[in-house]
From Swiss-Prot:
Gene3D superfamilies on file: 3.30.230.10, 3.40.50.670, Histidine kinase-like ATPase, C-terminal domain
UniProt keyword annotation of Isomerase present: yes
Names of the cofactor(s): Mg(2+); Mn(2+); Ca(2+)
Compositionally biased spans, kind Acidic residues: 644-654, 673-685
Enzyme Commission number(s): 5.6.2.2
Official protein name in the record: DNA topoisomerase 4 subunit B
Function: Topoisomerase IV is essential for chromosome segregation. It relaxes supercoiled DNA. Performs the decatenation events required during the replication of a circular DNA molecule.
């Protein structure tokens, strides 16, 4: 449990910055979107308030309940919200829930460190709810206030009376279905987020309950070892090479915790947090950690003779191959600085120095005390350098590919290039098989669409060394075509295309190729996914036709639900064709349904939850059979006849994001310019 911080949390510590009028008009500005991601963000905002209390040492239990009517209740055992009158003349509770940017985290009064970095939590949740109720127990007295119709108080704060209940705040709300495209909460998404919070709040118990089914479902997340258990969780389905290592310390008001462990994989997985909020773009704290680790390893390598005087130092990425690490720091509000509006990157200069010192001091001793293990890790890093140099060579060759014989022979007869050389407009279609590749070549828009048929087998890059990956002809061709290098040498500025679109058959083989390609992009060209440049084409499953000649009617359907609507529209006498492969479509049909920017449907692949994405790749593509078997049993329904690809789901089914997915995706109907519909690529139910 966190050490108590002696800051007052009372009515005077609540500051008011501005009103709440704009939230319902422009909800996306406050919660990101009005799809499933935005819906779940409401829960995180209220949970973050409870986390702030726990961070400050008040309360060690948080309960989150999805109730039968799909409302959410978040209850904590903190001090209870202030219940007196605010300086503005209305109850403080009302200020917290009806005024934007009202909270105890803006001044130095309520919290020393705060997790709710945007600080708009309670009021925004209230504004976007049909109703919200807050129950407060403070100093032996219970209070309650209700809000309806987007945050309007029903009466005022009511004093219910004396109680023996413990202090705390309970917030229950029902999201407004006129604002959100879905109001169905995903148990899995909430579980993943709450598990992460519990790992970071050592000793705090977080309980998630789902009352919607016939039998209530409940999970308790409680980790006495904190981020040490988080790292073990990240590596749960991998073969590990070391125990979990843990360092902690504090300097100049900044608290530092680092846990890490090596596995036998070839990629690094570093998750960093500031005040319990994920910094997905890293920042000064992450730089400090990486710098100090690299320095400690190189100094030790020279001390034991694994690096000679004439040898160059190993690079940080060499030491981080197979590393799973969690860095969590607590920074006082007065030192907190972020780069950019998303607050995904820490900018506090002092954080780098503090993390560097704390980690550097302890790591030097640790390497000496664990000499045998340390030397084996350095030998591993030397092998990683060899792979990195091979990757750099591949990148250099891909940059000069058109001038080099190797590049020309690799691409000859495979790539059908676009006429334009504008990387901001060009699209690359990775197409399964020659027959579909032929139709795509004929049907494409030559100006900006390039076609690369995949003829041979794509290697499973999760299990392979870099040298073996670079020997795979299909992978090598993609590297040359994309033109931005691979692995640590990848540079998105050199990418030849704005969109890289995977186009496969709607069957098991097609789905497998999608997974293999996404695994490669995730492991070795991750910036492509982070920049939103990787897509999956969604060809139709059905063609419904009627009549011939000029009077003929042709309609397409992407799901069984759409098929029923199309059949009603076409009427009696229709002919039904079920597409089993892209090759069954002629060039015109392929263009019209799958390649024309005016009419096609694309799925943009996205990573929302880095820890979950890492585990999902390992589960589906790694060496261990048992985790994969269990996941398939839980998520794949087997039928006597194949119903199509894993993407063959109705929009209603696919609106939920990433609780159990490897990577997330957004479905974009480009012609309509509507809000993106979010789906999970491997979230199969």
């Amino acid at each position: 449990m966190a050490k108590k911080i002696n800051n007052e949390y009372n009515d005077a510590s609540i500051q008011v910055l501005e009103g709440l009028e704009a939230v319902r008009k422009r909800p996306g500005m406050y919660i990101g979107s009005t799809d499933s991601r935005g819906l779940h963000h409401l829960v995180y905002e209220i949970v973050d308030n409870a986390v702030d209390e726990a961070l400050s040492g008040y309360g060690n239990e948080i309960n989150v309940t999805i109730q039968k009517d799909n409302s959410i209740c978040v209850a904590d055992s903190g001090r209870g919200m202030p219940t007196g009158m605010h300086a503005s003349g209305i109850p403080t509770v009302e200020v917290i829930f009806t005024v934007l940017h009202a909270g105890g985290k803006f001044g130095q009064g309520g919290y020393k460190t705060s997790g709710g970095l945007h600080g708009v939590g309670a009021s925004v949740v209230n504004a976007l709810s049909k109703w919200l109720e807050v129950h407060i127990v403070r100093d032996g007295v219970e209070y309650m206030e209700r809000f309806e119709d987007g945050g309007k108080p029903v009466g005022t704060l009511k004093k219910i009376g004396k109680t023996k209940k413990r202090n705390g705040t309970s917030v229950t709300f029902l999201p407004d279905d006129t604002i959100f495209s879905t109001t169905n909460f995903s148990y899995e998404i909430l579980a993943e987020r709450l598990r992460e919070s519990a790992f970071l709040l050592k000793g705090v118990k977080i309980t998630l309950t789902d009352e919607r089914g016939e039998e209530p479902k409940e999970e308790v997340f409680h980790y006495e070892e904190g981020i040490k258990e988080f790292v073990a969780y990240l590596n749960e389905e991998k073969d590990t090479l070391t125990p979990v290592v843990y360092f902690s310390g504090a300097k100049e008001g900044i608290e530092v915790e680092l846990a890490y462990q090596y596995n036998d994989g070839y990629s690094e997985n570093v998750l960093s947090f500031v005040n319990n909020v994920r910094t997905k773009d890293g920042g000064t704290h992450e730089v400090g950690m990486k710098t100090s680790m690299t320095k400690a390893y190189n100094e030790y390598a020279r001390k034991v003779g694994l690096l000679k005087e004439k040898d160059k130092n190993l690079e940080g990425s060499d030491f981080r191959e197979g590393l799973a690490a969690v860095l969590s720091i607590r920074v006082p509000e007065n030192l907190l600085q972020f780069e950019g509006q998303t607050k995904g990157k820490l900018g506090t200069p002092l954080a780098r120095t503090v993390v560097d010192n704390v980690v550097g001091e302890q790591m030097g001793f640790y390497l000496q005390e664990n000499s045998e293990m340390s030397q084996s890790l350095i030998r591993k890093a030397i092998k990683a350098r060899e792979a990195r140099e091979a990757a750099r060579k591949a990148r250099e060759e891909s940059r000069n590919g058109k001038k080099r014989k190797k590049g020309e022979s690799l691409l000859s007869g495979k790539l059908t290039p676009a006429q334009s050389r504008n990387p901001k407009k060009n699209e690359l279609y990775l197409v399964e098989g020659d027959s579909a590749g032929g139709s795509a070549k004929q049907g494409r828009d030559r100006k900006f669409q390039a076609i690369l048929p995949l003829r041979g087998k794509v290697i499973n890059t999760e299990k392979a060394k870099m040298q073996d990956i670079l020997k795979n002809e299909e992978i090598n061709t993609m590297i040359y075509t994309i033109g931005a290098g691979v692995g640590p040498e990848f540079s998105i500025e050199d990418c030849n295309y704005d969109k890289i679109i995977i186009m496969t058959d709607a069957d098991t083989d097609g789905a497998h190729i999608q997974v293999l390609l996404l695994t490669f992009f995730y492991r070795y060209m991750k910036p492509l996914i982070e920049a939103g440049k990787v897509y999956i084409a969604l060809p139709p499953l059905y063609k419904v036709s009627k009549g011939t000649g000029k009077k003929s009617v042709i309609e397409y359907a992407w799901t069984d639900g759409e098929l029923a609507e199309v059949i009603d529209k076409v009427g009696k006498g229709y002919m039904l064709q079920r597409y089993k492969g892209l090759g069954e479509m002629n060039a015109e049909q392929l263009w019209e349904t799958t390649m024309d920017p005016e009419t096609r449907t694309l799925i943009r692949v996205r990573i929302d939850d880095a820890a979950q994405a890492e585990r999902r790749v390992t589960t589906l593509m790694g060496d261990k059979v048992e985790p994969r078997r269990k996941w398939i049993e839980q998520h794949v329904q087997f039928t006597l006849e194949e119903d199509g690809s894993i993407l063959d789901r109705s929009e209603e089914d696919t609106s939920a994001p990433t609780g159990e997915s490897l990577l997330d995706a957004e479905k974009t109907k480009e012609a309509e310019q509507t809000d993106d519909t979010e789906i999970s690529l491997f979230d199969i139910e």
